[in-house]
């Protein structure tokens, strides 16, 4: 049995992750659950927090105290928290699955450096469908080439704190790489006022934050007379949770290194 720990276990995604671990039919088991040290829920049973009934795993407020109790940590928190957790796992030689978004370029370099010592799966989105879309986007960009305008539209719930979403940025990276462009040079984030005519080489991003939208992403390839749209819509966070647990199981026996869901799904 793969021993899995979830950090941020008292949050919405954390509860979904706990449920997904418990749905593996014995292939994995939740052996540790961690949340903020100042959480009033520390000591509560993780299964009860997730609405699953008692499972005998108390919520801890200190990752360092439970590092011997798991093989892989699943982390969907905040960049500042994740970076601290990476150092803990690095010292304890524990694998990680990271779904945190909003990292800066420099922070991603720190993550890559840590992957020299432990195996890490890092992805902006753990949905199987989204990762299939990334493969389709690469093909579409190569076929349609420079003859289309490319726009990426994403929508999420009102509580999401980063924009554009990590998934939207990853989609932009895939398209830009397929076209031989540098996303940092061609990305346009929102438009306002007298913008002038659209430059063909740009990749536009539009962001919506409203209600309880779990996650919608559309990449638009617009030419004269026709357009192609590749869309993914998530209706439940369990989609991401199951993908993250799948990645945690896949990591067993893997060498140190930085992987993503394309590796996990055999799409690379």
UniProtKB/Swiss-Prot annotation:
NCBIfam families: dapB (TIGR00036). The active site is at 156 (proton donor/acceptor), 160 (proton donor). GO terms for cellular component: cytosol. It holds the Pfam family DapB_C. NAD(+) binds at residues 8-13, 35, 99-101, 123-126. This is 4-hydroxy-tetrahydrodipicolinate reductase. Its EC number is 1.17.1.8. NADP(+) binds at residue 36. It catalyses: (S)-2,3,4,5-tetrahydrodipicolinate + NAD(+) + H2O = (2S,4S)-4-hydroxy-2,3,4,5-tetrahydrodipicolinate + NADH + H(+); (S)-2,3,4,5-tetrahydrodipicolinate + NADP(+) + H2O = (2S,4S)-4-hydroxy-2,3,4,5-tetrahydrodipicolinate + NADPH + H(+). GO terms for molecular function: 4-hydroxy-tetrahydrodipicolinate reductase; NAD binding; NADP binding; oxidoreductase activity, acting on CH or CH2 groups, NAD or NADP as acceptor. It is found in: Cytoplasm. (S)-2,3,4,5-tetrahydrodipicolinate binds at residues 157, 166-167. Pathway: Amino-acid biosynthesis; L-lysine biosynthesis via DAP pathway; (S)-tetrahydrodipicolinate from L-aspartate: step 4/4. Belongs to the DapB family. Its main location: cytoplasm. HAMAP family: DapB. InterPro entries: DapB_C, DapB_N, DapB_N_CS, DHDPR_bac, NAD(P)-bd_dom_sf. Keywords: Amino-acid biosynthesis, Cytoplasm, Diaminopimelate biosynthesis, Lysine biosynthesis, NAD, NADP, Oxidoreductase. Catalyzes the conversion of 4-hydroxy-tetrahydrodipicolinate (HTPA) to tetrahydrodipicolinate. GO terms for biological process: diaminopimelate biosynthetic process; lysine biosynthetic process via diaminopimelate.
